[in-house]
């Protein structure tokens, strides 16, 4: 039994499925699990597996794929068989052409992956049923969650980038007269009242299940107070409209919840100081969902209690409440999604802006080189699960890699370059495909001349020991003679087959290069790797490319000759 070949198969599969790095324990487990007769020889074979894993991890992803195709083509056939169309489950009470969904972001910050779940689900279901998708800006809190003009624009742009085109855009702040009309109707019906209790006093009564003294006063008195709220006779905090509910409800927050309150000098970006009575979220949302004909709502599990509050209004007016689908929170491991934390970080100078690549905003993911299709696929894969889901960056990277791999041209980027002088090598022009699977895209030409050094990365110093043989990728094989501030090497041969047979490591290189910086998000830090990019690399801003043996990057900007890229993933 060829242990080495079995280990190579599993190491390659593990590496390909996990960002280019095989996990030793996982490979050992696979080898011994598939071949239990090898267990008694574990001590003997683990060093063999370890050596194979190290070799596999030193290969570029393209080389790993090529090698696996050679030794185990069945893997790719099985992957094709396993592929099935992933989609969303059917919606309850949904009729073709009659489904209306909405996404209601607050324009007080850029929206993030967690918010994108509701947006994508709402849009995809409306599309699935040939219905209507509404973007409703929930912008009626000019005090605590203050809307800003820039975020209205950002949200529309981010939705467009995700491929989401609203059939209608609604601004809640344009609809205050509508909310006033319904508030007055509820007061006249005896289902709402104006409370002028100090907040602490009301809270004390509410928690004991005792009605506020204003609750059962005559409708005429309530309407008089309502007019005073509107005309400015009450100041901020002095009066609030409450919806009558069950004073014995187990959740005190549901008991006579506040529907409208006064905000003096709101200075709202759309309405200025025209209005001083503003609806709270549950009131405005309940009214709009009915008025706009919304049939299905996708809402985070943490907001489930909103439905309990809003149903009182629907019951009083005799309306049918939309079908509500609750889903869990979605987050990325180790990535900040909270708008308040992001805003604070930006204000303190910790983050560079709403598109800082360390963040989980849609803008940040876009800047980092994540494709909209990857985000959509991830959301649909997670679907309507009620439990919270924490996605690892590796999960998102795996989906994105599958999408960018066919489109990303390949280039050499040498981080922390050190010169290597090669003795005895002839002048040679290496012709390297821009993409190994797409010869029609052409080649890059890298010229080697004996009188000039090549540059290799300090990351590869562990491979460049005197006496070692390595292959300069797509160029030739060399023997390492001396390592210091520069490396001395001797030309050995051109043939790739010799390097393959002897399992010599592959090293990427450049001759003349243009300056390049790669910004790498690492937790709370941004690490900058400086180096050299192929001199004639024809890269453009926003292009996603693969720096071979380094990873996929998005070209962020070009300053003169210098290229600045942001690291996406392996």
From Swiss-Prot:
GO terms for cellular component: cytosol. Its main location: cytoplasm. It catalyses: tRNA(Glu) + L-glutamate + ATP = L-glutamyl-tRNA(Glu) + AMP + diphosphate. GO terms for molecular function: ATP binding; glutamate-tRNA ligase activity. The keyword ATP-binding applies. It comes from the Archaea. Pfam families: tRNA-synt_1c (PF00749), tRNA-synt_1c_C (PF03950), tRNA-synt_1c_C2 (PF20974). Keywords: Aminoacyl-tRNA synthetase, ATP-binding, Cytoplasm, Ligase, Nucleotide-binding, Protein biosynthesis. Its EC number is 6.1.1.17. One of its GO terms (biological process) is glutamyl-tRNA aminoacylation. A motif ('HIGH' region) lies at residues 105-115. It is found in: Cytoplasm. InterPro entries: Gln/Glu-tRNA_Ligase, Glu-tRNA-synth_arc/euk, Glu/Gln-tRNA-synth, Glu/Gln-tRNA-synth_Ib_cat-dom, Glu/Gln-tRNA-synth_Ib_codon-bd, Rbsml_bL25/Gln-tRNA_synth_N, Ribosomal_bL25/Gln-tRNA_synth, Rossmann-like_a/b/a_fold. CDD domains: GluRS_non_core. The keyword Transmembrane helix does not apply. Belongs to the class-I aminoacyl-tRNA synthetase family. Glutamate--tRNA ligase type 2 subfamily. Catalyzes the attachment of glutamate to tRNA(Glu) in a two-step reaction: glutamate is first activated by ATP to form Glu-AMP and then transferred to the acceptor end of tRNA(Glu). HAMAP family: Glu_tRNA_synth_type2. This is Glutamate--tRNA ligase. It comes from Pyrococcus horikoshii (strain ATCC 700860 / DSM 12428 / JCM 9974 / NBRC 100139 / OT-3). The gene is gltX.
């Amino acid at each position: 039994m060829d242990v080495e070949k079995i280990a190579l198969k599993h190491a390659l599969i593990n590496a390909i499925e996990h960002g280019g790095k095989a996990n030793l324990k996982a490979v050992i487990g696979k080898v011994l699990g598939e071949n239990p007769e090898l267990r008694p020889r574990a001590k003997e074979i683990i060093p063999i597996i370890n050596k194979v894993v190290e070799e596999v991890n030193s290969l570029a992803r393209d080389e790993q794929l090529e090698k696996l195709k050679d030794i185990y083509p069945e893997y790719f056939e099985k992957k094709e068989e396993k592929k099935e169309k992933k989609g969303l489950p059917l919606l309850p009470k949904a009729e073709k052409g009659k489904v209306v969904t909405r996404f209601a972001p607050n324009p007080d910050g850029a929206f993030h992956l967690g918010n994108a779940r509701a947006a994508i689900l709402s849009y995809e279901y409306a599309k699935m049923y040939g219905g209507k998708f509404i973007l409703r800006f929930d912008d009626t809190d000019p005090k605590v969650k203050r809307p800003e003009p820039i975020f209205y624009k950002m949200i529309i742009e981010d939705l467009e980038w995700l491929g989401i085109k609203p059939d209608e855009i609604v601004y809640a702040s344009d609809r205050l007269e509508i909310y006033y009309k319904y508030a007055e109707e509820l007061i006249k019906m005896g289902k709402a009242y104006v409370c002028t209790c100090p907040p602490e006093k009301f809270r004390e009564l509410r928690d004991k299940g005792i009605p506020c003294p204003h609750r059962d006063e005559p409708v005429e008195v309530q309407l008089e107070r309502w007019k005073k709220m509107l005309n400015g006779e009450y100041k901020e905090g002095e009066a609030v409209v409450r919806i009558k509910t069950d004073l014995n409800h187990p959740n005190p927050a549901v008991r006579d919840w506040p529907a409208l309150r006064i905000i003096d000098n709101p200075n709202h970006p759309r309405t200025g100081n025209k209005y001083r009575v503003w609806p709270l979220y549950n009131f405005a949302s309940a009214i709009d969902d009915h008025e706009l004909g919304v049939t299905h709502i996708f809402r985070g599990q943490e907001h489930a209690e909103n439905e309990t509050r809003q149903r009182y209004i629907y019951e009083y007016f005799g309306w049918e409440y939309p079908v509500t689908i609750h889903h869990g929170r979605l987050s990325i491991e180790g990535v900040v999604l909270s708008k308040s934390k992001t805003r604070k970080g930006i204000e303190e100078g910790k983050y560079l802006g709403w598109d800082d690549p360390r963040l989980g905003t849609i803008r940040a993911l876009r800047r980092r080189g994540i494709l909209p299709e990857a985000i959509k696929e991830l959301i649909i894969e997670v679907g309507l699960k009620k439990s919270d889901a924490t996605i690892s960056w590796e999960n998102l990277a795996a989906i994105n890699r599958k999408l960018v791999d066919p489109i990303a041209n390949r280039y050499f980027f040498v981080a922390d370059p050190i010169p290597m002088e090669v003795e005895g090598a002839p002048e040679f022009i290496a012709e390297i495909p821009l993409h190994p699977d797409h010869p029609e895209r052409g080649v890059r030409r890298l010229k080697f001349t004996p009188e000039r050094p090549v540059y290799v990365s300090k990351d590869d110093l562990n491979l460049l020991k005197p006496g070692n043989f390595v292959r300069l990728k797509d160029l030739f094989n060399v023997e390492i003679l001396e390592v210091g501030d520069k490396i001395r090497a001797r030309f050995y041969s051109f043939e790739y087959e010799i390097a393959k047979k002897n399992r010599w490591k592959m090293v990427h290189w450049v001759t003349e290069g243009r300056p390049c910086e790669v910004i790498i998000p690492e937790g709370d830090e941004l690490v900058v790797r400086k180096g050299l990019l192929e001199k004639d690399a024809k890269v453009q801003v926003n292009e996603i490319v693969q720096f071979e043996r380094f990873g996929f990057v998005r070209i962020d900007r070009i300053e003169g000759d210098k290229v600045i890229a942001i690291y996406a993933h392996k």
